[in-house]
Amino acid sequence: MSADKFRDSTHYRDWIFTEEDLSKTRAKVNEKFTNIVRERMLEELSLQNKEASLEVLPPTLTVEEELELVNYYSFQLNALSSALSLPTHIRSTAILFFKRFYLINSVMEYSPKIISFTSLFLATKCNDHYISIEQFCKNMPKTTPEEVLEYEFNVCQSLKWDLYVWLPFRPLQGFLLDCQTVLPKVAVEKFYECHDLSKKFLIETLHSDIYFLHSPSIIALGAIYHTNPTICLQYIEAKKIPELQPLIISISANLKATKKFKIEKKKAQDYGRKLYFCMNPLRNKSSALYLKRKAEEESTNNNKWAKKFSTSSNVLDKNPFE
């Protein structure tokens, strides 16, 4: 993959950050939706004729708790994709769709469980891997086609309609093919083994923030270094790019730490219970606020149709030939 080509992509422009910018982005999203959710909860309490004050509201999720839930559902999404025997590029695309969505939105606004399913179904369509929505939902516990499709537009919009994801698997293959040329003394079997282990390692670390910080090519080299440091260092020396060595070693260490990191199910369940009480009531179709907004929307639409019909009737009442 050409570095110049990647730097011209929307992936690089919109989805590569510094660590500081990534943290700030998540903090801003959390603050924004915390305020929105609190306002909606106050409206809901008022409609129920209950005390509506900030003191009685349940606590909202912190930035860290939101990130823990996003990472937990990233794990679940990876496991689900594996159970469905979906190709590597589809599961990778789905996880990155999912994580990108929550750089723009909050789990307090959109259910991470539903968005994970929506992201996966969208990834199958973007990669020409046809599955009917009915067949797809047969594999999803207690999920309907309507739920999966309801937020598909929101996901696409949040992704800025950038539905092509640059992944490290193609650069991985390219580097190891190049290695066979520049390192002729190394047995070919070593490269095959390195490829398979590196690919497996990358799949196991798809939930890492590394994908928001570095290009797929550098991530691929980090995976090669993790799997076979000797081959990676010899390749760097042969290509005369020693300045990349510290970065590659750092990425490899980061990915290794990510692989070991797993969220305890109990902790995720605790955050899930907290989330249940601080979800935006406007997303709950049985809430007083949702029913009120729906009635207002229907009334507005009915008035528009009535006005349009009235105008049409007046036109038809006139004889165009007089």
From Swiss-Prot:
Keywords: Cell cycle, Cell division, Cyclin, Nucleus, Phosphoprotein. The modification Phosphoserine is found at residue 310. InterPro entries: Cyclin-like_dom (IPR013763), Cyclin-like_sf (IPR036915), Cyclin/Ssn8 (IPR043198), Cyclin_C_2 (IPR031658), Cyclin_N (IPR006671), CyclinH/Ccl1 (IPR027081). One of its GO terms (molecular function) is protein serine/threonine kinase activator activity. GO terms for cellular component: nucleus; transcription factor TFIIK complex. Gene3D superfamilies: Cyclin-like (1.10.472.10). Its main location: nucleus. GO terms for biological process: cell division; regulation of transcription by RNA polymerase II; transcription initiation at RNA polymerase II promoter. It is found in: Nucleus. CDD domains: CYCLIN_CCNH_rpt1 (cd20524), CYCLIN_CCNH_rpt2 (cd20525). The keyword Magnesium does not apply. PANTHER family: CYCLIN. Essential for progression through the cell cycle. Possesses kinase activity that can be detected when myelin basic protein (MBP) is provided as an exogenous substrate. Belongs to the cyclin family. Cyclin C subfamily. One of the nine subunits forming the core-TFIIH basal transcription factor. Interacts with crk1 and skp1. This is Cyclin mcs2.
